């Protein structure tokens, strides 16, 4: 097993910055040692939003953005390494998810695209990188997402308590950790994404701090019911989605027959949509004794309060209470997935993604001279 220090890098669907964590990882332990959040320049955020909403761009523009994101991720890693006085040889590898700009897991040619050139990260940090985590799972018939439930299982499963982990980023996803049962997980639908898109267009703010704007409005029930009829919400798991589906254009289509609504009422309705779709999926999945929240949505007290109200038989808490800072969860997960890759261990869960089999996932971009460490030797497939 490739035990040692790993760095995880995550730039999620909320586009609120780059999260970077440092952790010591071995077969039995994931010990977070440091973290930081690195700002995302507004022009890069805008370019990503444009792609995700289907605006055309040239291959040159895509290549430039891929380069810029790789440099941005490297800057974030170098800042953490400088803060912790680390040399490249002190770090086994960087696990970098990349920035998802398109995710289309169904149809005749399922595909997903994460950008942020891993070669730039290697060249600028001197540390080997593991990236491109999702496409192996898709090649095996899976959704390529979510991948974090495997990490939730390793850290947060309980021998007797029915638990769920809820990550509320741009998209919300659930991990079902039930004793004696295979782990399940799926995207419930929008997390912060639609609320962020609406307040950005209406007020020029990146997010609704503490849900205060939503709290000033009233839920428009006919609009909420129209939103809930979107076919994604009735699609059975395994399922996954992203900004290419739930975006500002989606809001505009829902509002087409609701002209003149107060903007704060739309925001209140979007918050209720997130809360109600999550709560419904918790209940349809059999319920949980404890729902542990991570991600940026966990800092929205209005949203958390609505979830608690909709789930009266469930203890709603934060992963912070379990010793894992919610804002760092996904970056920490990709540090762990990098460890799994270099150790030749599967990183996906077929019970979550629908893949035909568990597999080593991710591509390795080695540093030169490999950080004075050898790359993993993967076990031969059965029967070979």
Curated annotation (Swiss-Prot):
It is an enzyme of class 2 (transferase). ATP binds at residues 12-19. Pathway: Amino-sugar metabolism; 1,6-anhydro-N-acetylmuramate degradation; Cell wall biogenesis; peptidoglycan recycling. It comes from the Bacteria. CDD domains: ASKHA_NBD_ANMK (cd24050). Coiled coil: none annotated. SUPFAM superfamilies: Actin-like ATPase domain. The keyword Cytoplasm does not apply. GO terms for biological process: 1,6-anhydro-N-acetyl-beta-muramic acid catabolic process; amino sugar metabolic process; peptidoglycan turnover. Belongs to the anhydro-N-acetylmuramic acid kinase family. HAMAP family: AnhMurNAc_kinase. PANTHER family: ANHYDRO-N-ACETYLMURAMIC ACID KINASE (PTHR30605:SF0). This is Anhydro-N-acetylmuramic acid kinase. It comes from Cronobacter sakazakii (strain ATCC BAA-894).
């Amino acid at each position: 097993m490739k035990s040692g220090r790993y760095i995880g890098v995550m730039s999620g669907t909320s586009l609120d910055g780059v999260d970077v964590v440092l952790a010591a990882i071995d077969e039995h332990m994931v010990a977070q040692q440091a973290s930081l959040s690195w700002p995302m320049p507004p022009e890069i955020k805008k370019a990503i939003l444009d792609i995700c909403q289907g605006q055309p761009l040239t291959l040159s523009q895509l290549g430039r953005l891929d380069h810029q994101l790789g440099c941005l991720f490297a800057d974030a890693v170098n800042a953490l390494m400088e803060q912790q006085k680390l040399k490249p040889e002190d770090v086994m590898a960087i696990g970098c998810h990349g920035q998802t700009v398109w995710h289309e897991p169904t149809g005749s040619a399922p595909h997903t695209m994460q950008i942020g050139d891993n070669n730039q990260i290697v060249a600028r940090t001197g540390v080997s990188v593991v990236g491109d985590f999702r496409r192996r799972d898709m090649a095996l018939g899976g959704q390529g997402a979510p991948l974090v439930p495997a990490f939730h299982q390793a850290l947060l499963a309980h021998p007797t308590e029915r638990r769920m982990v809820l990550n509320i980023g741009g998209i919300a996803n659930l991990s079902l950790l039930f004793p004696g049962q295979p782990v399940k997980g799926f995207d419930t639908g929008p997390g912060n994404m639609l609320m962020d898109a609406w307040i950005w267009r209406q007020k020029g703010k990146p997010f609704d701090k503490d849900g205060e704007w939503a709290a000033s409005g009233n839920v428009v029930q006919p609009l909420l019911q129209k939103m809930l009829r979107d076919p994604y919400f009735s699609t059975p798991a395994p399922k996954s989605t992203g900004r290419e589906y739930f975006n500002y254009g989606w809001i505009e289509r829902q509002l087409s027959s609701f002209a003149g609504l107060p903007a704060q009422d739309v925001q209140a309705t979007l918050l209720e949509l997130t809360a109600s779709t999550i709560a419904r999926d918790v209940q349809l999945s059999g319920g949980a004794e404890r729902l542990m929240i991570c991600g940026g949505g966990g800092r929205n007290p209005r949203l958390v309060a609505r979830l608690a109200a909709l789930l009266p038989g469930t203890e709603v808490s934060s992963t912070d209470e379990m010793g894992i800072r919610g804002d760092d969860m996904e970056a920490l997960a990709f540090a762990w997935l990098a460890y799994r890759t270099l150790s030749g261990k599967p990183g996906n869960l077929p019970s979550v993604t629908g893949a035909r089999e568990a597999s080593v996932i991710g591509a390795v971009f080695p540093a030169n001279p490999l950080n004075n460490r050898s790359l993993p030797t993967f076990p031969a497939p059965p029967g070979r």
